[in-house]
Amino acid sequence: MDEKARALGTRVIHSPAPLVKKGDFIRALRAELRHGSYDVLHCHHDILSAVYLLAASGMPIQRRIVHVHNADESVPSGSRLKQRLYREPMRQVCLRMADHIVGISNYTLDAFLARRARRPERDSVHYYGVDPTPFETVSGDRVGFRRQLDLSDDALILLFGGRLVPEKNPVFAVDVLAKLRGMESHAVAIFVGSGSQERDVLQHARELGLEDCVRLLGWRNDLPEIMSCSDWFILPHPEHPVEGFGLAVVEAQLAGLRMLLSHGILDDPLLPTASFRRLPLADGPTLWAKAAVERLQQPTPSRAAAIAALHESPMDMDRALKGLLKLHT
């Protein structure tokens, strides 16, 4: 990633001190800010952006932006007491010292503001810009992809894409697969991503006798191709706190996938063309599997229609870039 950024003309600087050593980190950041004569400080570290703002205190920086990507308001401390003690003061630092508070979704912004009214010209939503090009050029070789994974040519693929961590709830997808195979015997599950629950996913699949029906692919650079060869996309995100945005949800639509979503997924990433069912996790895997079968009986979503809808949305790359540049001027 560093080399890609440098190739585009950026300068990549790694802090000589980790964030956990707060004093050393702040001193190093202040030294760089002083040396670089920066015009804009754009912080992407959610509530921890307070550390960057404090480090920049008194510096002649024209604009300070806090960009919030998650709604969990995580404070990296093993002590729950410290997390509670630090969270609100850090939020107040952001609200008082930043010129702009930007959320990647309506919920994310309002959660960070803690139900305070949005301030005109200061608090706003800026969606990710999504490039549809990779989805326009996929081959969509469904049979070839299945043979690569030693699956039957007519396998129906339930795709989970993202980190395999409790915050994404991947184990629930295995339960859904177990019920789904009772309705569609050719159903299989593919997990693209990695994380702390990789072993849990495999172990649960073994316990349910599904080991031969589950594939863990790790992180892949060809996710658009994998999506285009799948049948469903599942994201059973926990309902509290909700997903900050859900970029993979947008990508699944561009790939023409039917989607099974929990109430932990917001409306923000949904295009008008979306084919989806949103269900409570409490409904259990049987109802989720039934919803998958019902979606399968509907016409295959149009990739072209989804791409056209994206271009008319705030997630259009050109529109998102203009909005980002406006924040800096």
Residue ranges and their predicted role:
Residues 136-151:
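A short helix/loop element that forms part of the nucleotide-sugar donor recognition site in Leloir-type
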Residues 156-179, 196-202:
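A conserved mid-protein helix/loop that constitutes part of the nucleotide-sugar donor-binding site
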Residues 189, 197-200, 211-220, 226:
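Active-site donor-binding acidic/aromatic loop of nucleotide-activated sugar
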Residues 1-23, 195-198, 327:
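N-terminal strand-loop element at the rim of the active site
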Residues 27-30, 58, 83-101, 117-121:
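Membrane-proximal helix-turn-helix segments that form the acceptor-binding/catalytic region
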Residues 95-136:
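A short, active-site helix/loop in glycosyltransferases that binds the activated sugar's phosphate group
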Residues 43-49, 67-68:
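Short His-centered aromatic/hydrophobic patch
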